[in-house]
Amino acid sequence: MGKIIGIDLGTTNSCVAIMEGGEPVVIQNAEGGRTTPSIIGFTSDGGRVVGQPAKNQMVTNPEHTIYSIKRFIGSRFNELTGEAKKVPYKIVPQGDDVRVEVEGKLYSTQEISAFILQKMKKTAEDYLGEAVTEAVITVPAYFNDAQRQATKDAGKIAGLDVKRIINEPTAASLAFGFNKDSKREKIIAVYDLGGGTFDISILELGDGVFEVKSTNGDTHLGGDDFDARIVQWLEQGFKSDTGIDLGNDRMALQRLREAAEKAKIALSSSASTEINLPFITADANGPKHLQRTLSRSEFEKMTDDLFERTKEPCRKALKDAGISADRIDEILLVGGSTRMPKVAHVIKDVFGKEGSKGVNPDEAVAIGAAIQGGILGGDVKDVLLLDVTPLSLGIETMGGVFTPLISRNTTIPTRKSQVFSTAADGQTAVSIHVLQGERGMANQNRTLGNFDLVGIPPAPRGVPQIEVTFDIDANGIVHVSAKDLGTGKEQHIRIESSSGLSESEIDRMVKEAEANAESDKREREKIEARNVADSLIYQTEKTLKEAGDGVNAADRARIDEAIAELKTVLSGDDVASIKAKTEILQQASYKIAEEMYKRQAAAGAAAGKKSDAPSGNEAEGGDVDYEVVKDEDSK
C-alpha cells in the first residue's frame, strides 16, 4: 500500500502533507511554496495553469481565472444567493446545478476542484518519487452531505481514492494534540476562519482520544467577505472623487480585489496601509490613479458585523456540547483570517481568554489530514478520532413536518431506525423525502434526495410498518433505506451530490483528467522551455552589452544569430526546436564566458606582477608599515 497523503482543500489556499518517520511533513510545491493558491487559470492557447502561475494572470485575464470555487461546490444554482455575481468568471445554471463557463465549455465545481487536487497530488508525487493514489481530504465541519459528496467526487476525478473526508477543525486538533504525552483530559475549542468558511468545534482530548463534542459554523463567511468590504470602500471612494464607477470594469475590479487582500494582510501588523493603484482607469481627461489610506480602525469598523457573525456559532457550539466557556482549556486559531487582530477581541469576548497560537494556522489542517492518513494506513497507533455530524437528518412526514432521525452533533459513524406508516387507506407506495437541517418544517430544510418504496400491500391507513434507516459513514456521507416490515421489501439510496454528477459523468471526467494529464505535462514542458530560453536570451544580451569590445566581431555575430534563431522558434510551439536552439545559444554563450574569464585572469595576473614590484618607500628602506602601527598604539 502506498502513502496516504493529507490535503487541505482550501477556499484561498491548499496544502498537502505526508507522514514520514512517524512525523507529519508539509510538502513544498514546484514554486517553492508550502501552500498553493486554490486558483485555476485558463490560458489563451487553451492551456491550464494552477496555483501561483494562475494567480499571476488574475488581473490580465479575470474572466478565465477561477478562484474560491469551494464557495460553490455541492450547491444548487438557486442556493448561491448572489455570490455568483461577485466573481469575474461566469457561473451559469445547468438544470439545478452550478457550472463554470470558460470559452463556451462548461465545468462542474467538482472538475475545477479536481484541478487543484491534481496539483496537490503532483506536488506529493514529485516529493516522494512515486505515484500517489490515496488521500484524506478536509472539508469545513459545517459542510452538508452534498458538499462532502461533491468533494469526494472531486478527489475521484483527480485520480485519488479518498479514504476519508475529515472536518477541518478536527484535523487541526489532531495536529495540535499529536505526540503530546498528556494523560490529563483537555477541552479545546477550534476557531477556524478561512478564506470562505467559518467553523467552530469543541473537542475533548485525552490519552490519544480526540472526541468532537459539538460543531457549528457558517459556510459563507471568510476572508473573501472581508476583502469584499475593502473593495466596496475603494469603489465608493473612487466614484465619489472622480464620478467613475469601477464596478463594471472587470480588470479594474480584479486589481481592487488584489489590493484589498494585500491591505487586509498589511493591517494585521500595521495600524494603517497605503493603497496605490496607478492607471486604474481613464476618461476623456486622461488616466486616473487610485490612492487611499486605510487604517486598521476603519477596516474593523467596516467589517464589524462579519466579526460579530462568528460569535453566535461559538455560543451555540458551547451550548450543544453542554460546556461553559470557562471550562475551555485552550482555543486554537486556525485559518489565515485568524491573523486579523480583531479576532483576538472576539475570542476574549466569547471565551474569556486569549486564543492559542499552538499550531500554524495555514498548515495545521493539512498536517491533521496527514495524521489521519497515517491512522488509516496503520502508521499511527493509539489514536482514536470521534467526529460528529454537523446537521440533523430526517424525513418529511404528514403535514410537511421535518422529523429528525439523527440529531446534529451525533458521533459518527452512526445508524438510526424509526418505524413509520401510511397516511391514506389502500396506499401501496410511500415517497421518502430525505432532508438535512434544523428547521421544523420540511420545506425550510435542504433536500438531500427522494426515493419510493413500492409494492406495499393495500391496507388501512396506519397499518403498514415502514422502517426507515439512516446510516452515516465516517466521512459524514448519508445512506438511507426503507423497508416494509410486512413483506420484507426494501429500497436503498445513497444520497448523491446535489451537483447532479452521476457515476458515469464522474467516470467520464476521470478519463478526461487522465487524458489531459499528458497535455498538461506537455504544456508545463513548453512553459519551462520558454522560461529557460527567455532567461538565457536576457542573460546573454546583458553579458554582450557588459563585455563591449571584449568580444570579437565573429563571436558576436555568431551569438546574435543564435539569439535571433531562438527568438524565431519562441514565436511557435515546437518545444523540441526551442530546446535545440536554446542549446546552441547556451554553447555559444559558454564560449564568451570562457573568453571573458581568460581575459580577466590575464588582467589579474598582470595586476599581480605590478603589485609585486617594490614601492617607492620600500625601495628607500622606509619603515612605513611599522610606523603606522606604532602611531595606532600610541593613541
UniProtKB/Swiss-Prot annotation:
Name of protein: Chaperone protein DnaK
Region of interest: Disordered: 601-635
Keywords: ATP-binding, Chaperone, Nucleotide-binding, Phosphoprotein, Stress response
Role summary: Acts as a chaperone.
NCBIfam families (alphabetical): PRK00290.1, PRK05183.1, prok_dnaK
Induction profile: By stress conditions e.g. heat shock.
Assigned protein family: Belongs to the heat shock protein 70 family.
Pfam families referenced in this protein's UniProt entry, alphabetically: HSP70
Record GO terms (molecular function): ATP binding; ATP-dependent protein folding chaperone; unfolded protein binding
Modified residues (Phosphothreonine): T197
